[in-house]
Amino acid sequence: MSKSNPNFPIIGGVIAAIGAGLCCAGPFVLLLLGVSGSWIGNLTLLEPYRPIFILLVLALFGFAGWKVYRPVEDCEPGTSCAVPQVRKRRQVIFWLTALTALVLVTSNYWIVWFA
């Protein structure tokens, strides 16, 4: 039986957050990088799917938080979640990526101040 990747929920959450922020922050970031063209306006076509991406972000980060902060007693002996240094590193990575996802998901509201 194959072991699941413990980082999958975090990686999936960040990818979903990128999808949620692509319609709003995407054109702004591309313009900051010097990329231009009329096709950039097509990124707003993803706006109707934004709530789905946001729900996906919440679900994946909720699952990741549950996996990262579950009690040590629930971990099998010898696995990485039972090692204190690995647990601490995963918690830091979880919060850094959650903050990144929050910035991307809320970009629809704050990007207007910079554009």
Curated annotation (Swiss-Prot):
<keyword id="KW-0812">Transmembrane</keyword>
<feature type="transmembrane region" description="Helical">
    <location>
        <begin position="45"/>
        <end position="65"/>
    </location>
</feature>
<dbReference type="Pfam" id="PF02411">
    <property type="entry name" value="MerT"/>
</dbReference>
<feature type="binding site">
    <location>
        <position position="24"/>
    </location>
    <ligand>
        <name>Hg(2+)</name>
    </ligand>
</feature>
<protein>
    <recommendedName>
        <fullName>Mercuric transport protein MerT</fullName>
    </recommendedName>
</protein>
<comment type="function">
    <text>Involved in mercury resistance. Probably transfers a mercuric ion from the periplasmic Hg(2+)-binding protein MerP to the cytoplasmic mercuric reductase MerA.</text>
</comment>
<dbReference type="GO" id="GO:0015097">
    <property type="term" value="F:mercury ion transmembrane transporter activity"/>
</dbReference>
<keyword id="KW-0997">Cell inner membrane</keyword>
<feature type="binding site">
    <location>
        <position position="75"/>
    </location>
    <ligand>
        <name>Hg(2+)</name>
    </ligand>
</feature>
<comment type="similarity">
    <text>Belongs to the MerT family.</text>
</comment>
<keyword id="KW-0479">Metal-binding</keyword>
<keyword id="KW-0476">Mercury</keyword>
<feature type="transmembrane region" description="Helical">
    <location>
        <begin position="92"/>
        <end position="112"/>
    </location>
</feature>
<keyword id="KW-0472">Membrane</keyword>
<keyword id="KW-0614">Plasmid</keyword>
<dbReference type="InterPro" id="IPR003457">
    <property type="entry name" value="Transprt_MerT"/>
</dbReference>
<keyword id="KW-0475">Mercuric resistance</keyword>
<keyword id="KW-1003">Cell membrane</keyword>
<feature type="transmembrane region" description="Helical">
    <location>
        <begin position="10"/>
        <end position="30"/>
    </location>
</feature>
<keyword id="KW-1133">Transmembrane helix</keyword>
<dbReference type="GO" id="GO:0005886">
    <property type="term" value="C:plasma membrane"/>
</dbReference>
<keyword id="KW-0813">Transport</keyword>
<dbReference type="GO" id="GO:0046872">
    <property type="term" value="F:metal ion binding"/>
</dbReference>
<feature type="binding site">
    <location>
        <position position="23"/>
    </location>
    <ligand>
        <name>Hg(2+)</name>
    </ligand>
</feature>
<feature type="binding site">
    <location>
        <position position="81"/>
    </location>
    <ligand>
        <name>Hg(2+)</name>
    </ligand>
</feature>
